[in-house]
């Protein structure tokens, strides 16, 4: 087979891989967003679901009155995403320590650390510097997008609206959206609590980069966790169900963008069986997003 034919096959394979990747990781979320918009935002399903948990006689959401439920599902639940972000920051800082020690490898401190557990941790941090910074940036962008949408749509929570004893009018987000300026004082769309759990999707992309065989299970667990976080707030009257879906969509898309910038599509699309041979994160460098050579290797 001549070189022109080989190159044509490589181009076809690369194009097919690219379409498959974006079809799954971008096309499916966009389709789901349209489905949520049509099913929830253009209908009264949100209110019908929320009505199930509202005591119209007492004028309250009974579960929302439980301090224990609030502590377990809202305050304590934030520990997992908060610790993940904090550990990423600590890891990113520590990733610069070992390279500094290597410059003074003849020092007493460097010799002591070389065979110690602390030295092992520092070398681990150096190897995964790119991953730590990815998690930090992914968390920052997804959180920033959620806060931007909250302030630029000014949607009030169910308990704050006249539908459930509050004083504010219930207005859908797309009727209130303002691109450049804050739309008002409402801060309920998308769901912030659910988004904190969905922010852990950054860990899925790290796992996918290393072709971890359980990455799909990790993805399912994170999505389930986000749904649980969001649903508990629905039970308390602080969110509609669609707010949780939108939070997941926004966080997924923003995290996907950061993952593409840090790792590149070809790294995120590698078959599981190539895990050991491909990724060696020894430096804080980004990989080209659509490397033809990488596509050809992963296809082979």
Task: Give the positions of each predicted feature.
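N-terminal transmembrane-helix/juxtamembrane module of multi-pass inner/ER membrane proteins
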Residues: 2-115, 153, 180
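Membrane-interfacial segments
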Residues: 97-109, 153-157, 161, 211, ...
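Membrane-embedded catalytic cores of phosphoryl/pyrophosphoryl-handling enzymes
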Residues: 16-17, 23-24, 171-285
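Alpha-helical membrane-inserting segments
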Residues: 35, 39, 89, 93, ...
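Long, low-complexity, intrinsically disordered cytosolic termini of multi-pass membrane proteins
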Residues: 1, 275-300
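Alpha-helical transmembrane segments in multi-pass membrane proteins
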Residues: 77, 134-138, 142, 146, ...
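Interfacial segments of alpha-helical transmembrane regions
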Residues: 104-152, 215, 219
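Membrane-interface interhelical connector segments
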Residues: 154-182
């Amino acid at each position: 087979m001549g070189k022109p034919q080989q190159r044509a096959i490589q181009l076809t394979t690369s194009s097919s891989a690219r379409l498959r990747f974006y079809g799954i990781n971008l096309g499916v979320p966009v389709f789901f967003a349209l489905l949520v918009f049509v099913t929830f935002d253009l209908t009264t399903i949100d209110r019908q679901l929320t009505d199930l948990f509202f005591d119209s006689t007492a004028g309250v959401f009974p579960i929302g009155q439980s301090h224990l439920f609030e502590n377990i599902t809202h305050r304590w639940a934030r520990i997992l995403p908060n610790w993940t972000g904090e550990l990423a920051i600590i890891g990113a800082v520590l990733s610069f320590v070992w390279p500094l020690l290597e410059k003074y490898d003849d020092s007493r401190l460097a010799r002591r650390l070389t065979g110690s557990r602390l030295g092992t941790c520092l070398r681990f941090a150096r190897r995964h510097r790119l991953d730590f910074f990815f998690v930090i940036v992914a968390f920052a962008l997804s959180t920033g997008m959620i806060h931007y949408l909250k302030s630029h749509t000014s949607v009030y929570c169910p308990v704050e609206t006249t539908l459930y004893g509050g004083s504010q009018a219930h207005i859908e987000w797309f009727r209130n959206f303002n691109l450049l300026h804050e739309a008002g004082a409402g801060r309920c769309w998308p769901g912030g609590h659910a988004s904190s759990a969905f922010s852990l999707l950054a860990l899925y992309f790290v796992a996918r980069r290393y072709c971890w065989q359980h990455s799909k299970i990790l993805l399912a667990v994170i999505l389930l966790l986000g749904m649980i976080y969001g649903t508990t707030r629905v039970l308390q009257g602080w969110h509609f169900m669609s707010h949780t879906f939108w939070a997941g969509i926004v966080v997924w898309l923003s995290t996907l963008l950061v993952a593409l910038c840090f790792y590149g599509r070809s790294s995120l699309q590698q078959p599981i069986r190539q895990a050991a041979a491909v990724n060696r994160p020894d430096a804080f460098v980004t990989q080209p997003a659509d490397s033809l050579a990488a596509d050809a290797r992963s296809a082979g």
